[in-house]
């Protein structure tokens, strides 16, 4: 439902999201520190499995690839190939299909995880756990792994298990209402881009790098959970430029 920001702040899910940090790391296993690899680019030698699709997660993988990481995009053959999205966010990545509903597919992914530094995950909460690739499983397969997951509504609260995407979160969290107010006519308006997706994508890349550095310093296996709704709250906290609605000449 369309809400203003005050209504979202009073909603149980809005309150649950407000109680979360933007980046919520959790140590999920023990492992010795693993030294960073040297190379010509900042992330040279970093191996990333990108199990995400559409915008938010793939933007994170693209940012890591742009700084030298070796990123493999893992796609399900059962899901549609979205041409524009892959052209935009697949740059610099390898791509492969892997059907995790089959034993062969699960064995293939397990072998890839065993050689990875980072796994990006945008599956619905608990979906990968049911397939044998939850955070604890990843830490067992690859001690020292960094797991970065994202969802729409956050990791706690009554909507934690719901599916969602940028436009729904914009509407529920008051962004469309605020855009209408800024336009002066009060009619709900979407942001001019999928800002929550793109913003969260860059937070994905930041979190992955931060936790890989932490692993190199103190060891351990790590999981970080992010959400579009928490990114929305962070973007709100940055404030707005009054009178800046429309094109700037």
Q: Which residues are covered by each model-predicted region?
A:
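Acyl-CoA thioester-binding alpha/beta core of soluble enzymes
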Residues: 1-78, 106, 110, 114-118, ...
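Glycine-rich phosphate-binding loop and adjoining beta1-alpha1-beta2 segment
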Residues: 69, 73-99, 104
């Amino acid at each position: 439902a369309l809400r203003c920001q005050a209504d979202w702040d009073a909603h149980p899910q809005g309150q649950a999201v407000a109680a979360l940090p933007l980046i919520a790391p959790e140590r999920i296993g023990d492992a010795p520190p693993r030294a960073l690899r040297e190379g010509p680019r900042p992330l040279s030698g970093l191996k990333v499995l990108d199990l995400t699709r559409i915008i938010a997660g793939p933007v994170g993988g693209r940012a890591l690839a742009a700084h030298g990481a070796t990123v493999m995009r893992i796609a399900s053959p059962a899901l549609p190939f979205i041409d524009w999205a892959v052209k935009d966010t697949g740059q610099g990545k390898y791509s492969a299909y892997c059907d995790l509903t089959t034993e062969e597919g699960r064995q293939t992914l397990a072998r890839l995880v065993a050689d990875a530094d980072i796994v990006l995950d945008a599956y619905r909460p608990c979906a990968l756990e049911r397939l044998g690739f939850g955070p604890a499983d990843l830490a067992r397969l690859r001690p020292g792994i960094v797991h970065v997951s994202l969802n729409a509504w956050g990791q706690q609260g009554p909507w934690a298990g719901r599916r969602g995407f940028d436009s729904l979160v914009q509407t529920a969290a008051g962004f469309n209402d605020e855009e209408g107010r800024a336009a002066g006519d009060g009619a709900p308006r979407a942001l001019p881009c999928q800002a929550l997706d793109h913003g969260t994508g860059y937070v994905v890349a930041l979190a992955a790098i931060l936790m890989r550095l932490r692993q190199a310093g103190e060891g351990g296996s790590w999981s970080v959970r992010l959400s579009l709704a928490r990114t929305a709250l962070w973007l709100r906290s940055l404030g707005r430029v009054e009178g800046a609605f429309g094109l700037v000449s």
